[in-house]
Amino acid sequence: MRDIIFTFFNYFVFFYTSMLAIFFVTFAFLSFISLKRRKDYYVESYMRKTIKESPYTPGISVIAPAFNEEKTIIDNVNSMLALEYPLFEVVIVNDGSTDSTLEKMTEYYELVEVPYAYIERIKTRPFRRLLKSSNPKYSRLIVVDKENGGTKADASNAGINVASHPYFICTDVDCILEKYALYRCISPIISSEKQVIAVSGTMLMANGCVVKDGQIIDVRTPRTPIPLFQNLEYMRSYLIGKMGWSAINGMPNVSGGFGLFDRSVAIAAGGYDAPSFAEDMDLITRMVGYMCDFSRPYKIVQIPDTCCWTEGPPNLAMLYRQRTRWARGLFQTLNTVSYTHLTLPTTSRV
């Protein structure tokens, strides 16, 4: 009996490691093809010039929920307002902060309440008011004040309701966006024949980098082991895993830290699910389900360019909590999604 168990274990380990190796080699090859294709047609300086001069450039709403961020809110909002793109707005959702987050923004950006007909396309906690700056310098800024919903998803849904552009980016208020991130994200949309419902940008660790005025001025590798290995994991995940999935139109997820979405499809799919532990994966799954239900061709694209920098958990305790939440969110999504939407990529489904 012992020999049978030992033999079975050996075969299992051999089979598992072999399949894992084949998987990574296959996706590395697919990623290489995707990178080569992008290199052949994408020249960033030319793309920026074309997008900037075109009268048909689609607008983008950058949505960032904020809860008790009084210490960093001004620097973070200034960083978003400094983005380069011809047509965008920054929507900050004050999710019932109990500190002076809203007061600091009101004073610094000279915010005043404006009349606004709030259309609740996606249900959220009660909307209080909408504020805009009386200073033309901050004309791109919109601040939504609402009751606390307890989750980032609820605040993001309020931002989607207020957004006025056809595409939106959901990010965390403490993330650092690359100056040309919006150009990079919109390029697959304007160059694709199929409808692109979501674009995933590459994220890396900001741990160890030098930050000034809300921008990364010196890229450095993290100095401690845990953020360093997370950085390597992010590079593998985005540049091999997601680039490979993107090549066969089978992207399973667009990160909640930075992703661009088609607003009309997101609203039709019901927006973010507030109780979900992985609202980003849940949204993508339902957007794909919506497109499949109406037999509409679509694409979800991963771009290799770095668009966002985020602070990774610096210790094992915080890393454990983060990964546990991700795992719970994955099982929650798999438990609630219709299995008809989990078919092979050849049927244009995830």
Regions found by a protein language model. Give the residues of each.
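N-terminal membrane-anchoring/stem segments of glycan-assembly enzymes
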Residues: 1-56
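Cell-envelope/extracellular polymer assembly enzymes that use nucleotide-activated donors
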Residues: 59-61, 89, 282
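Short, acidic, metal-binding catalytic loop of nucleotide-sugar glycosyltransferases
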Residues: 78-87, 111-112
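A conserved acidic beta->alpha catalytic loop
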Residues: 94-114, 148
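Short aromatic/hydrophobic "clamp" motif used to bind/position activated sugar donors
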Residues: 168
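Conserved small/polar residues in nucleotide/adenosyl-binding loops
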Residues: 340-346
